[in-house]
Amino acid sequence: MMVTVVSNYCQLSQTQLSQTFAEKFTVTEELLQSLKKTALSGDEESIELLHNIALGYDKFGKEAEDILYHIVRTPTNETLSIIRLIKNACLKLYNLAHIATNSPLKSHDSDDLLFKKLFSPSKLMTIIGDEIPLISEKQSLSKVLLNDENNELSDGTNFWDKNRQLTTDEIACYLQKIAANAKNTQVNYPTGLYVPYSTRTHLEDALNENIKSDPSWPNEVQLFPINTGGHWILVSLQKIVNKKNNKLQIKCVIFNSLRALGYDKENSLKRVINSFNSELMGEMSNNNIKVHLNEPEIIFLHADLQQYLSQSCGAFVCMAAQEVIEQRESNSDSAPYTLLKNHADRFKKYSAEEQYEIDFQHRLANRNCYLDKYGDANINHYYRNLEIKHSQPKNRASGKRVS
Protein backbone atom coordinates (compact mmCIF):
# COMPACT_ATOMS: atom_id res chain seq x y z
CA MET A 1 0.00 0.00 0.00
CA MET A 2 1.23 3.49 -0.88
CA VAL A 3 0.05 6.24 1.43
CA THR A 4 0.12 10.02 1.27
CA VAL A 5 2.09 11.87 3.91
CA VAL A 6 -0.23 14.44 5.48
CA SER A 7 0.85 16.00 8.74
CA ASN A 8 0.13 19.21 10.65
CA TYR A 9 -3.46 19.15 9.39
CA CYS A 10 -4.37 22.46 10.99
CA GLN A 11 -1.70 24.23 8.89
CA LEU A 12 -2.89 22.91 5.50
CA SER A 13 -4.90 25.04 3.11
CA GLN A 14 -7.45 23.47 0.76
CA THR A 15 -4.96 23.78 -2.14
CA GLN A 16 -2.22 22.13 -0.13
CA LEU A 17 -4.57 19.35 0.89
CA SER A 18 -5.32 18.53 -2.75
CA GLN A 19 -1.57 18.32 -3.48
CA THR A 20 -0.69 15.95 -0.66
CA PHE A 21 -0.55 12.88 -2.88
CA ALA A 22 2.80 13.97 -4.28
CA GLU A 23 4.83 12.36 -1.47
CA LYS A 24 4.15 8.71 -0.67
CA PHE A 25 5.68 5.80 1.21
CA THR A 26 5.02 2.07 1.46
CA VAL A 27 3.04 0.69 4.40
CA THR A 28 4.01 -2.63 5.96
CA GLU A 29 2.80 -4.56 8.98
CA GLU A 30 6.06 -3.72 10.74
CA LEU A 31 5.56 -0.01 10.09
CA LEU A 32 2.03 -0.11 11.50
CA GLN A 33 3.17 -1.75 14.71
CA SER A 34 6.04 0.71 15.03
CA LEU A 35 3.65 3.66 14.56
CA LYS A 36 1.27 2.17 17.13
CA LYS A 37 4.07 1.92 19.68
CA THR A 38 5.31 5.48 19.14
CA ALA A 39 1.74 6.85 19.03
CA LEU A 40 1.09 5.31 22.44
CA SER A 41 4.16 7.12 23.72
CA GLY A 42 2.55 10.41 22.66
CA ASP A 43 4.31 11.04 19.35
CA GLU A 44 1.97 13.37 17.43
CA GLU A 45 3.51 12.69 14.02
CA SER A 46 2.92 8.95 14.45
CA ILE A 47 -0.71 9.63 15.35
CA GLU A 48 -1.18 11.72 12.21
CA LEU A 49 0.54 9.11 10.04
CA LEU A 50 -1.80 6.45 11.44
CA HIS A 51 -4.70 8.69 10.41
CA ASN A 52 -3.23 8.98 6.90
CA ILE A 53 -3.05 5.21 6.61
CA ALA A 54 -6.50 4.78 8.18
CA LEU A 55 -8.04 6.78 5.31
CA GLY A 56 -7.14 3.93 2.95
CA TYR A 57 -9.56 1.18 1.94
CA ASP A 58 -7.20 -1.80 1.97
CA LYS A 59 -6.33 -4.09 4.88
CA PHE A 60 -3.71 -1.69 6.23
CA GLY A 61 -6.25 1.13 6.22
CA LYS A 62 -8.64 -0.98 8.26
CA GLU A 63 -5.91 -2.07 10.66
CA ALA A 64 -4.71 1.51 11.25
CA GLU A 65 -8.31 2.59 11.82
CA ASP A 66 -8.75 -0.26 14.31
CA ILE A 67 -5.61 0.82 16.18
CA LEU A 68 -6.87 4.38 16.61
CA TYR A 69 -10.39 3.25 17.47
CA HIS A 70 -9.17 0.74 20.08
CA ILE A 71 -7.03 3.37 21.81
CA VAL A 72 -9.99 5.76 21.99
CA ARG A 73 -12.50 3.12 23.12
CA THR A 74 -10.30 1.64 25.87
CA PRO A 75 -9.05 4.67 27.79
CA THR A 76 -6.61 4.41 30.68
CA ASN A 77 -5.00 7.08 32.83
CA GLU A 78 -1.87 6.73 30.69
CA THR A 79 -3.66 7.19 27.35
CA LEU A 80 -5.99 10.12 28.09
CA SER A 81 -3.62 12.68 26.56
CA ILE A 82 -3.00 10.41 23.54
CA ILE A 83 -6.76 10.04 23.03
CA ARG A 84 -7.06 13.83 23.00
CA LEU A 85 -4.41 14.01 20.25
CA ILE A 86 -6.21 11.32 18.23
CA LYS A 87 -9.56 13.07 18.50
CA ASN A 88 -8.02 16.41 17.54
CA ALA A 89 -6.34 14.91 14.47
CA CYS A 90 -9.58 13.19 13.44
CA LEU A 91 -11.59 16.38 13.76
CA LYS A 92 -9.01 18.42 11.83
CA LEU A 93 -9.15 15.92 8.97
CA TYR A 94 -12.93 16.04 8.95
CA ASN A 95 -13.03 19.83 8.91
CA LEU A 96 -10.51 19.98 6.06
CA ALA A 97 -12.45 17.41 4.06
CA HIS A 98 -15.68 19.28 4.81
CA ILE A 99 -14.22 22.46 3.33
CA ALA A 100 -12.71 20.65 0.34
CA THR A 101 -15.91 18.85 -0.66
CA ASN A 102 -18.29 21.59 0.49
CA SER A 103 -20.52 18.88 1.99
CA PRO A 104 -19.98 16.88 5.19
CA LEU A 105 -22.53 14.22 4.35
CA LYS A 106 -22.36 13.14 0.69
CA SER A 107 -19.33 11.02 -0.07
CA HIS A 108 -20.34 10.62 -3.73
CA ASP A 109 -19.69 14.34 -4.28
CA SER A 110 -15.98 13.55 -4.31
CA ASP A 111 -14.12 10.84 -6.19
CA ASP A 112 -11.17 11.27 -3.87
CA LEU A 113 -10.67 8.30 -1.52
CA LEU A 114 -9.01 10.71 0.89
CA PHE A 115 -12.47 11.96 1.87
CA LYS A 116 -14.83 9.03 1.44
CA LYS A 117 -14.08 7.30 4.72
CA LEU A 118 -14.97 10.47 6.59
CA PHE A 119 -18.46 10.54 5.04
CA SER A 120 -19.52 6.90 5.33
CA PRO A 121 -20.01 4.38 8.16
CA SER A 122 -16.54 4.00 9.67
CA LYS A 123 -14.76 3.95 12.99
CA LEU A 124 -13.08 7.23 12.14
CA MET A 125 -16.52 8.79 11.84
CA THR A 126 -17.48 7.64 15.34
CA ILE A 127 -14.38 9.35 16.74
CA ILE A 128 -15.27 12.51 14.82
CA GLY A 129 -18.83 12.52 16.12
CA ASP A 130 -17.60 12.31 19.70
CA GLU A 131 -15.83 15.63 19.21
CA ILE A 132 -18.44 17.58 17.25
CA PRO A 133 -20.19 19.87 19.77
CA LEU A 134 -23.33 20.67 17.77
CA ILE A 135 -26.17 18.23 18.43
CA SER A 136 -27.72 19.04 15.05
CA GLU A 137 -24.53 18.01 13.25
CA LYS A 138 -24.27 14.84 15.33
CA GLN A 139 -27.81 14.01 14.24
CA SER A 140 -26.97 14.63 10.58
CA LEU A 141 -23.88 12.44 10.84
CA SER A 142 -25.97 9.75 12.54
CA LYS A 143 -28.12 9.39 9.42
CA VAL A 144 -25.00 8.62 7.39
CA LEU A 145 -23.25 6.52 10.02
CA LEU A 146 -26.31 4.33 10.57
CA ASN A 147 -26.93 4.00 6.82
CA ASP A 148 -30.64 4.59 7.34
CA GLU A 149 -31.97 2.88 4.21
CA ASN A 150 -35.09 1.72 6.06
CA ASN A 151 -35.93 5.25 7.27
CA GLU A 152 -36.10 3.99 10.86
CA LEU A 153 -34.43 6.98 12.43
CA SER A 154 -36.16 10.10 13.62
CA ASP A 155 -34.57 13.46 12.84
CA GLY A 156 -33.38 13.61 16.43
CA THR A 157 -31.49 10.29 16.45
CA ASN A 158 -27.98 10.62 17.85
CA PHE A 159 -25.62 7.69 17.17
CA TRP A 160 -23.57 8.63 20.23
CA ASP A 161 -26.56 8.56 22.59
CA LYS A 162 -25.92 5.63 24.95
CA ASN A 163 -29.65 5.01 25.33
CA ARG A 164 -30.86 5.02 21.72
CA GLN A 165 -32.65 2.21 19.90
CA LEU A 166 -30.60 -0.17 17.78
CA THR A 167 -31.47 -0.23 14.08
CA THR A 168 -32.38 -3.22 11.91
CA ASP A 169 -28.95 -3.15 10.27
CA GLU A 170 -27.10 -3.11 13.59
CA ILE A 171 -29.14 -6.02 14.95
CA ALA A 172 -28.73 -7.98 11.71
CA CYS A 173 -24.93 -7.50 11.67
CA TYR A 174 -24.55 -8.73 15.23
CA LEU A 175 -26.85 -11.73 14.91
CA GLN A 176 -25.38 -12.84 11.59
CA LYS A 177 -21.93 -12.83 13.18
CA ILE A 178 -22.82 -14.85 16.28
CA ALA A 179 -24.93 -17.32 14.26
CA ALA A 180 -22.43 -17.77 11.44
CA ASN A 181 -21.26 -21.22 12.55
CA ALA A 182 -24.33 -22.33 14.52
CA LYS A 183 -25.55 -25.83 13.67
CA ASN A 184 -28.66 -26.08 15.85
CA THR A 185 -30.18 -22.60 15.52
CA GLN A 186 -30.89 -20.36 12.56
CA VAL A 187 -31.35 -16.59 12.81
CA ASN A 188 -33.57 -14.89 10.25
CA TYR A 189 -33.15 -11.31 9.05
CA PRO A 190 -34.87 -8.76 11.34
CA THR A 191 -38.12 -7.33 9.99
CA GLY A 192 -41.08 -5.23 11.00
CA LEU A 193 -44.25 -6.99 12.09
CA TYR A 194 -46.71 -5.79 9.45
CA VAL A 195 -46.24 -5.53 5.70
CA PRO A 196 -46.91 -1.85 4.81
CA TYR A 197 -50.46 -1.11 3.64
CA SER A 198 -51.54 -4.68 4.40
CA THR A 199 -52.95 -6.83 7.20
CA ARG A 200 -50.28 -9.46 6.43
CA THR A 201 -47.16 -9.80 8.51
CA HIS A 202 -43.58 -10.31 7.39
CA LEU A 203 -43.43 -13.32 9.72
CA GLU A 204 -46.21 -15.23 7.96
CA ASP A 205 -44.64 -14.46 4.57
CA ALA A 206 -41.31 -15.87 5.77
CA LEU A 207 -42.89 -18.97 7.32
CA ASN A 208 -44.99 -19.80 4.26
CA GLU A 209 -42.06 -19.26 1.91
CA ASN A 210 -39.94 -21.72 3.88
CA ILE A 211 -42.48 -24.56 4.00
CA LYS A 212 -43.25 -24.23 0.29
CA SER A 213 -39.58 -24.82 -0.50
CA ASP A 214 -39.20 -27.50 2.21
CA PRO A 215 -42.35 -29.09 3.72
CA SER A 216 -40.25 -30.67 6.49
CA TRP A 217 -39.10 -27.23 7.69
CA PRO A 218 -38.17 -26.23 10.38
CA ASN A 219 -35.48 -28.77 11.20
CA GLU A 220 -33.74 -26.58 13.78
CA VAL A 221 -34.77 -23.74 16.05
CA GLN A 222 -35.67 -20.62 14.06
CA LEU A 223 -35.22 -17.15 15.58
CA PHE A 224 -37.04 -14.12 14.17
CA PRO A 225 -36.19 -10.62 15.49
CA ILE A 226 -39.33 -8.55 14.86
CA ASN A 227 -40.04 -4.86 15.32
CA THR A 228 -43.66 -4.47 16.40
CA GLY A 229 -43.53 -0.70 15.93
CA GLY A 230 -40.86 1.03 18.01
CA HIS A 231 -40.21 -2.16 20.00
CA TRP A 232 -38.16 -5.29 19.23
CA ILE A 233 -39.19 -8.82 20.23
CA LEU A 234 -37.69 -12.23 19.50
CA VAL A 235 -39.84 -15.05 18.13
CA SER A 236 -38.51 -18.60 18.54
CA LEU A 237 -40.05 -21.37 16.45
CA GLN A 238 -39.33 -25.07 16.87
CA LYS A 239 -40.82 -28.37 15.74
CA ILE A 240 -40.82 -30.82 18.64
CA VAL A 241 -42.24 -34.21 19.55
CA ASN A 242 -45.00 -33.85 22.13
CA LYS A 243 -44.13 -36.32 24.90
CA LYS A 244 -47.78 -36.86 25.84
CA ASN A 245 -48.89 -38.34 22.53
CA ASN A 246 -45.62 -38.70 20.62
CA LYS A 247 -46.85 -36.41 17.83
CA LEU A 248 -45.12 -33.46 16.20
CA GLN A 249 -45.94 -30.00 17.42
CA ILE A 250 -44.90 -26.45 16.61
CA LYS A 251 -43.70 -24.65 19.74
CA CYS A 252 -43.44 -20.87 19.57
CA VAL A 253 -41.92 -18.66 22.26
CA ILE A 254 -42.29 -14.87 21.99
CA PHE A 255 -39.62 -13.14 24.08
CA ASN A 256 -40.58 -9.60 25.07
CA SER A 257 -38.34 -7.44 27.25
CA LEU A 258 -41.33 -5.35 28.38
CA ARG A 259 -44.03 -6.49 30.81
CA ALA A 260 -46.72 -6.60 28.10
CA LEU A 261 -47.01 -6.52 24.32
CA GLY A 262 -50.57 -5.41 23.69
CA TYR A 263 -53.75 -7.29 22.83
CA ASP A 264 -53.71 -6.58 19.07
CA LYS A 265 -50.09 -7.58 18.58
CA GLU A 266 -50.45 -10.75 20.62
CA ASN A 267 -53.52 -11.71 18.61
CA SER A 268 -51.69 -11.04 15.33
CA LEU A 269 -48.83 -13.30 16.37
CA LYS A 270 -51.21 -16.05 17.52
CA ARG A 271 -53.06 -15.85 14.21
CA VAL A 272 -49.81 -16.11 12.25
CA ILE A 273 -48.60 -19.20 14.15
CA ASN A 274 -51.97 -20.97 13.97
CA SER A 275 -52.21 -20.20 10.25
CA PHE A 276 -48.67 -21.47 9.73
CA ASN A 277 -49.54 -24.71 11.51
CA SER A 278 -52.46 -25.27 9.11
CA GLU A 279 -50.33 -24.40 6.08
CA LEU A 280 -47.61 -26.77 7.26
CA MET A 281 -50.07 -29.65 7.61
CA GLY A 282 -51.36 -28.91 4.11
CA GLU A 283 -47.88 -28.86 2.57
CA MET A 284 -46.92 -32.08 4.34
CA SER A 285 -50.08 -33.77 3.07
CA ASN A 286 -49.47 -32.53 -0.48
CA ASN A 287 -46.00 -34.03 -0.36
CA ASN A 288 -47.19 -37.37 1.09
CA ILE A 289 -45.58 -36.73 4.44
CA LYS A 290 -47.93 -38.67 6.68
CA VAL A 291 -47.36 -37.00 10.02
CA HIS A 292 -50.07 -35.50 12.20
CA LEU A 293 -49.40 -32.18 13.89
CA ASN A 294 -50.82 -31.20 17.25
CA GLU A 295 -52.19 -27.71 17.77
CA PRO A 296 -49.25 -25.32 18.20
CA GLU A 297 -48.09 -24.24 21.63
CA ILE A 298 -47.63 -20.47 21.85
CA ILE A 299 -45.93 -18.96 24.91
CA PHE A 300 -45.52 -15.24 25.56
CA LEU A 301 -42.53 -14.62 27.80
CA HIS A 302 -42.95 -11.05 29.07
CA ALA A 303 -39.60 -10.64 30.81
CA ASP A 304 -40.02 -7.07 32.14
CA LEU A 305 -36.32 -6.19 31.84
CA GLN A 306 -36.47 -2.53 30.87
CA GLN A 307 -37.01 -0.85 34.22
CA TYR A 308 -33.69 0.99 33.92
CA LEU A 309 -33.05 0.58 30.18
CA SER A 310 -36.01 2.09 28.39
CA GLN A 311 -34.54 2.01 24.84
CA SER A 312 -32.70 -1.31 25.02
CA CYS A 313 -35.23 -3.71 23.50
CA GLY A 314 -32.96 -4.29 20.47
CA ALA A 315 -30.01 -5.03 22.73
CA PHE A 316 -32.15 -7.48 24.74
CA VAL A 317 -33.19 -9.27 21.54
CA CYS A 318 -29.53 -9.64 20.54
CA MET A 319 -28.49 -10.89 23.99
CA ALA A 320 -31.44 -13.31 24.17
CA ALA A 321 -30.70 -14.70 20.72
CA GLN A 322 -27.04 -15.11 21.63
CA GLU A 323 -28.01 -17.03 24.76
CA VAL A 324 -30.15 -19.46 22.75
CA ILE A 325 -27.53 -19.93 20.03
CA GLU A 326 -24.59 -20.52 22.38
CA GLN A 327 -26.42 -22.79 24.81
CA ARG A 328 -27.91 -24.91 22.04
CA GLU A 329 -24.48 -25.37 20.50
CA SER A 330 -23.41 -26.90 23.81
CA ASN A 331 -26.63 -28.90 24.20
CA SER A 332 -28.91 -29.22 21.17
CA ASP A 333 -31.75 -30.50 23.38
CA SER A 334 -31.95 -27.21 25.30
CA ALA A 335 -35.44 -25.73 25.03
CA PRO A 336 -35.56 -22.06 23.93
CA TYR A 337 -38.20 -21.21 26.55
CA THR A 338 -36.04 -22.53 29.40
CA LEU A 339 -32.96 -20.74 28.07
CA LEU A 340 -34.79 -17.44 27.62
CA LYS A 341 -36.53 -17.65 30.99
CA ASN A 342 -33.27 -18.41 32.81
CA HIS A 343 -31.52 -15.61 30.93
CA ALA A 344 -34.19 -13.09 31.94
CA ASP A 345 -34.23 -14.25 35.56
CA ARG A 346 -30.44 -13.91 35.82
CA PHE A 347 -30.49 -10.42 34.36
CA LYS A 348 -33.14 -9.19 36.80
CA LYS A 349 -30.92 -10.17 39.73
CA TYR A 350 -28.27 -7.64 38.71
CA SER A 351 -28.22 -4.20 40.30
CA ALA A 352 -29.15 -1.15 38.23
CA GLU A 353 -25.46 -0.29 37.85
CA GLU A 354 -24.62 -3.80 36.67
CA GLN A 355 -27.50 -3.74 34.18
CA TYR A 356 -26.25 -0.42 32.77
CA GLU A 357 -22.76 -1.89 32.39
CA ILE A 358 -24.02 -5.06 30.65
CA ASP A 359 -26.09 -2.92 28.29
CA PHE A 360 -23.13 -0.62 27.60
CA GLN A 361 -20.73 -3.49 26.88
CA HIS A 362 -23.23 -5.16 24.56
CA ARG A 363 -23.83 -1.92 22.66
CA LEU A 364 -20.07 -1.51 22.27
CA ALA A 365 -19.73 -5.05 20.88
CA ASN A 366 -22.73 -4.44 18.63
CA ARG A 367 -21.23 -1.17 17.36
CA ASN A 368 -17.87 -2.81 16.62
CA CYS A 369 -19.61 -5.59 14.69
CA TYR A 370 -21.65 -3.09 12.67
CA LEU A 371 -18.64 -0.92 11.82
CA ASP A 372 -16.52 -3.97 10.94
CA LYS A 373 -19.16 -4.97 8.41
CA TYR A 374 -18.63 -1.73 6.53
CA GLY A 375 -14.87 -1.89 6.99
CA ASP A 376 -14.76 -5.36 5.43
CA ALA A 377 -17.14 -4.31 2.66
CA ASN A 378 -14.90 -1.34 1.85
CA ILE A 379 -11.84 -3.60 1.66
CA ASN A 380 -13.65 -6.02 -0.66
CA HIS A 381 -14.82 -3.13 -2.84
CA TYR A 382 -11.28 -1.73 -3.00
CA TYR A 383 -9.72 -5.00 -4.12
CA ARG A 384 -12.59 -5.73 -6.51
CA ASN A 385 -12.00 -2.38 -8.21
CA LEU A 386 -8.30 -3.14 -8.49
CA GLU A 387 -9.11 -6.52 -10.02
CA ILE A 388 -11.49 -4.94 -12.54
CA LYS A 389 -8.97 -2.22 -13.35
CA HIS A 390 -6.19 -4.69 -14.12
CA SER A 391 -8.19 -7.43 -15.85
CA GLN A 392 -9.18 -7.66 -19.50
CA PRO A 393 -12.65 -9.33 -19.59
CA LYS A 394 -15.44 -6.84 -20.23
CA ASN A 395 -18.35 -8.90 -18.96
CA ARG A 396 -18.37 -9.54 -15.22
CA ALA A 397 -21.15 -10.71 -12.93
CA SER A 398 -21.50 -10.54 -9.18
CA GLY A 399 -24.19 -11.60 -6.73
CA LYS A 400 -25.04 -10.96 -3.11
CA ARG A 401 -27.01 -13.17 -0.76
CA VAL A 402 -28.17 -12.20 2.71
CA SER A 403 -28.71 -15.22 4.92
UniProtKB/Swiss-Prot annotation:
The active site is at H231, C313 (nucleophile). GO terms for biological process: protein desumoylation; protein deubiquitination; proteolysis. InterPro entries: ElaD/SseL-like_N (IPR054329), Papain-like_cys_pep_sf (IPR038765), Peptidase_C48_C (IPR003653). It comes from the Bacteria. The keyword Protease applies. Pfam families: ElaD_SseL-like_N, Peptidase_C48. Changing C313S: Abolishes deubiquitinating activity. One of its GO terms (molecular function) is cysteine-type peptidase activity. Keywords: Hydrolase, Protease, Thiol protease. SUPFAM superfamilies: Cysteine proteinases (SSF54001). Its EC number is 3.4.22.-. It is an enzyme of class 3 (hydrolase). Protease that can act as an efficient and specific deubiquitinating enzyme in vitro. Does not possess desumoylating and deneddylating activities. The physiological substrate is unknown. Belongs to the peptidase C79 family. This is Protease ElaD. It comes from Escherichia coli (strain K12).
